[in-house]
Amino acid sequence: MAAASAPVPGPGGASSTARGRIPAPATPYQEDIARYWNNEARPVNLRLGDVDGLYHHHYGIGAVDHAALGDPGDGGYEARLIAELHRLESAQAEFLLDHLGPVGPGDTLVDAGCGRGGSMVMAHQRFGCKVEGVTLSAAQAEFGNRRARELGIDDHVRSRVCNMLDTPFEKGTVAASWNNESSMYVDLHDVFAEHSRFLRVGGRYVTVTGCWNPRYGQPSKWVSQINAHFECNIHSRREYLRAMADNRLVPQTVVDLTPETLPYWELRATSSLVTGIEEAFIESYRDGSFQYVLIAADRV
């Protein structure tokens, strides 16, 4: 993504940007988003990451392990609930990585909208490869780079502040790339054109995203609430497929994860970490106006 206003230390104390400085936001909207995520410190993100040091900025999938949760009446229940939410979020990241295709230790991956870097760490641990992350938020990039140094993988995992629509990666050099709940901050044709540029022919692009359902007619009131809460612009499923086709990204797999993510939201709504947006997600998933999907596409 794009920029903020202060240098971001990278490995060895260097800036995390290619030019040794943080570029200015390209638009006022990018500046607003950088400010939003620089100031974000929700317990729902930080306390879940504290479970095992993987800090995510996406939601979870899969069945809730009620046996692991145990009795809601005992003193350790909230900690177990937090651990279970985190397990479901990591399961989502694993599912995304499952769809990246063949990746070797000599390859480079790109996480567009990398947050605090949890998925990047998981990708390196699985494939042994280099993982580059881009974000609008200087605070997120600094956090991700600090975590990489603590883990001793900063020679392979790096976050930088830059515009995901205008990255420094050379044409055709990236094996696979993804947007994990970050494509709602950009124009789809613009972001897919950039992925298509830096992906090698035969490379894989994956997105996991919430999208409004064209069969509903228009974005529902719940989708509008989500847009307002996160200062984003949720696209329709149809828009994703059309923009991919226009940019030489041919979908190979489309998975509707809506039934898989609803249990996560229903559990999160019972925790002390609620943010006020849980009802909008739950109701929009239930009424069919909002969907949670994975799309994996090959660069041709």
From Swiss-Prot:
Molecular function via GO: C-methyltransferase activity; magnesium ion binding; S-adenosyl-L-methionine binding; S-adenosylmethionine-dependent methyltransferase activity
Pfam families, A to Z: CMAS (PF02353)
Enzyme Commission identifier(s): 2.1.1.255
Coiled-coil ranges from the UniProt annotation: none
Region (Disordered): 1-24
The UniProt record lists the keyword Methyltransferase: yes
Presence of keyword Methyltransferase: yes
Cofactor requirement: Mg(2+)
Matching InterPro entries: Erg6_SMT_methyltransf, GPPMT_Stmyces, SAM-dependent_MTases_sf
Stated family: Belongs to the geranyl diphosphate 2-C-methyltransferase family.
Catalytic activities: (2E)-geranyl diphosphate + S-adenosyl-L-methionine = (E)-2-methylgeranyl diphosphate + S-adenosyl-L-homocysteine + H(+)
Stated name of the protein: Geranyl diphosphate 2-C-methyltransferase
Protein function: Catalyzes the SAM-dependent methylation of geranyl diphosphate (GPP) to yield (E)-2-methylgeranyl diphosphate (2-MeGPP).
CDD domains: AdoMet_MTases
UniProt keyword terms in alphabetical order: Magnesium, Methyltransferase, Plasmid, S-adenosyl-L-methionine, Transferase
GO biological process: methylation; terpene metabolic process
